[in-house]
Amino acid sequence: MKNFQIYLSTAPVLAAVWFTVLAGILIELNRFFPDALSFPLT
């Protein structure tokens, strides 16, 4: 189990998880606000 935790804390694994989460957020934003180049605050 300790080796698995060390594996999960390596930079490539963390980067893959982070980019997957970021892509999901961007896909959902694009689904609710299509073709939004900027988000009006008012």
From Swiss-Prot:
One Pfam short name: PSI_PsaJ
Keyword Metal-binding: no
Membrane topology field: Single-pass membrane protein
Keywords: Chloroplast, Membrane, Photosynthesis, Photosystem I, Plastid, Thylakoid, Transmembrane, Transmembrane helix
Top-rank taxon: Eukaryota
An annotated GO BP: photosynthesis
Chain ranges passing through the membrane: 7-27
Compartment(s) where it occurs, according to its Swiss-Prot or TrEMBL record: Plastid, Chloroplast thylakoid membrane
Cellular component GO terms, alphabetical: chloroplast thylakoid membrane; photosystem I
Keyword Oxidoreductase set for record: no
Stated role: May help in the organization of the PsaE and PsaF subunits.
Record-stated family: Belongs to the PsaJ family.
UniProt-recorded name of the protein: Photosystem I reaction center subunit IX
Species whose genome carries this gene: Ostreococcus tauri
